Curated annotation (Swiss-Prot):
Cofactor binding note from Swiss-Prot or TrEMBL: Manganese or magnesium. Binds 1 divalent metal ion per monomer in the absence of substrate. May bind a second metal ion after substrate binding.
Transmembrane regions listed in the UniProt entry: none
Family, as annotated: Belongs to the RNase HII family.
One Pfam short name: RNase_HII
Protein known as: Ribonuclease HII
Length: 206
């Protein structure tokens, strides 16, 4: 598998874009917890070694890379809570998290590289959507690392408050054990009621 590179950013810099943010989100698929996004502006001279798509990196290495990025890059994190997911739908909530991540950067970017084919409306800057961008752009890969680490920490904290669902390991995703716990324990305040498996339990649909 090819690794992410810095060519998109280099080409854009040659066209005059100086603050290029990679943007990625995590948490569209879980039954519980927020959807989160990160925006990262890399320093071309201080890119952490081994930076890669979060799915290709161990949890321990993700933590180390996120700590490095906090020191050498500009980082913003955005969250859309469960109530917003249920009110807006997951796509719009993910876009809201992306906008909040961009807004959380220390200074506004002039270009955003966004993972996927879809991009939010009302972006504060120019943008390119890149399919499988976390495997192609180092800036997006950095955002995928930051977002994943941030959300895993949130879900671990929620797991301590609401034990039994296994969120510390499944991060809210619909594993067999998580689905079984939903039936056994019931629906928590952090479950997404608009998602069918949760909705069906609440309304006893079979």
């Amino acid at each position: 598998m090819s690794r992410p590179h810095f060519q998109f950013e280099t080409d854009l810099a040659a066209r005059g874009y100086l603050r290029i943010a990679g943007v990625d989100e995590v948490g569209r698929g879980p039954l519980a917890g927020p959807v989160m996004a990160a925006a990262v502006v890399l320093d071309p001279g201080a890119i952490p070694e081994g930076l890669n798509d979060s799915k290709q990196v161990t949890a321990k290495r993700r933590e180390a890379l996120a700590a490095q990025l906090a020191q050498v890059a500009q980082v913003g994190v955005g969250v859309a809570e469960v109530a917003e997911i249920d009110r807006l739908n997951i796509r719009r909530a993910a876009h809201l998290a992306m906008l909040r991540a961009l807004d959380a950067l220390p200074a506004p970017p002039d270009m955003a590289l966004i993972d996927g084919r879809d991009r939010p409306d009302d972006l504060p800057c120019a943008a390119h959507a890149i399919i499988k961008g976390d495997t192609k752009s180092l800036s997006i890969a950095a955002a995928s690392i930051v977002a994943k680490v941030a959300r895993d920490r949130v879900m671990t904290a929620l797991a301590a408050e609401f034990p039994g669902y296994g969120w510390e390991t499944n991060a809210g995703y619909p594993t067999q054990a998580h689905r079984a716990a939903l039936l056994d324990i019931g629906v928590s305040p952090h479950h997404r009621r608009s998602f069918r498996p949760v909705h069906n339990i609440l309304y006893q649909e079979k």
